[in-house]
Swiss-Prot record:
Domain of life: Bacteria
EC number(s) stated in the UniProt entry for this protein: 4.4.1.21
Protein name: S-ribosylhomocysteine lyase
GO biological process: quorum sensing
Organism of derivation: Finegoldia magna (strain ATCC 29328 / DSM 20472 / WAL 2508)
Family: Belongs to the LuxS family.
GO MF entry, a single one: iron ion binding
InterPro entries: LuxS_sf, Metalloenz_LuxS/M16, S-ribosylhomocysteinase
Subunit (UniProt): Homodimer.
Lineage: Bacteria, Bacillati, Bacillota, Tissierellia, Tissierellales
Keywords on record: Autoinducer synthesis, Iron, Lyase, Metal-binding, Quorum sensing
Length: 156
């Protein structure tokens, strides 16, 4: 089997940031998949499922309310070091920096019940940690608010 593109990224050099993971074509539409990397792989602890789950619910709610039909998907990476965001359109990392700032500011300032945090709405509603979601959101904002080229383009 051929190695898929995401496994060709040097995770030993990968830093937290916003990266274009891939672009797919569906008819005349371009779908851009972004790698929203929150922790440095293999060098920082991964996020626990509870904070990942809270960020997923808050992030999906925020993005779908803000961008509506432009959002195809927002969800966690299996390695728990970040999230994938798939948007309609041929986009670059730089194009969504302000959006990602707004998203993680929303999460870091969020108070109240997490959207969809009920047995009726979610298959694992009790596994959410808003405090840690805020912690990781603030950590990520430190990177995004001082974004550099190495946080926008995958390392060689």
């Amino acid at each position: 089997m051929n190695k898929i593109e995401s496994f060709k990224i040097n995770h030993l050099k990968l830093m937290p940031g916003i990266y274009v993971s891939r672009k797919d074509y569906l008819g005349n539409e371009v779908l851009t998949t972004f790698d929203l990397r929150i922790t440095a792989p293999n060098r920082e602890p991964v996020m626990n499922t509870a904070e990942v789950h809270a960020i997923e619910h808050l992030g999906a709610t925020f993005l779908r309310n803000k961008l509506e039909n432009e959002v195809i998907y927002f969800g966690p990476m299996g390695c728990r070091t970040g999230f994938y965001l798939i948007l309609v359109g041929d986009k670059k990392s730089e194009d969504i920096v302000d959006l990602i700032k707004e998203l993680f500011e929303f999460i870091s300032n969020y108070e109240g019940e997490i959207p969809g945090q009920s047995a009726k709405d979610c298959g694992n509603y009790s596994d959410m940690n808003l405090s840690m979601a805020k912690f990781y959101s603030n950590k990520y904002l430190n990177v995004i608010n001082n974004i550099k080229k190495e946080n926008l383009i995958y390392p060689e």
